[in-house]
Amino acid sequence: MDPAGPDNDERFTYDYYRLRVVGLIVAAVL
């Protein structure tokens, strides 16, 4: 995995957004 990849930031943003969505769903259920 190359941290200097052109899509590194995009992938990180997608993962972070997905994590936030999962967190919101869990918070709503709890």
From Swiss-Prot:
The record's Gene Ontology cellular component field reads: chloride channel complex; endoplasmic reticulum membrane
In the record, which residues are listed under signal peptide? none
Indicate how the chain sits in the lipid bilayer. Answer: Single-pass type I membrane protein
Q: Which GO terms describe its biological process?
A: regulation of monoatomic ion transport
Known post-translational modifications?
A: Phosphorylated by protein kinase a (PK-A) and protein kinase C (PK-C). Phosphorylated in response to insulin and adrenergic stimulation.
Location comes to: Microsome membrane; Endoplasmic reticulum membrane
Main subcellular location of this protein, as a coarse class: membrane
Tell me yes or no: is Iron-sulfur among this UniProt entry's keywords: no
Q: Which molecular function terms from Gene Ontology are attached?
A: chloride channel activity; ion channel regulator activity
Q: Which UniProt keywords apply?
A: Chloride, Chloride channel, Endoplasmic reticulum, Ion channel, Ion transport, Membrane, Microsome, Phosphoprotein, Transmembrane, Transport
Role of this protein: Induces a hyperpolarization-activated chloride current when expressed in Xenopus oocytes. May have a functional role in muscle contraction.
Q: Which family does it belong to?
A: Belongs to the FXYD family.
What name does UniProt use for this protein? Phospholemman-like protein
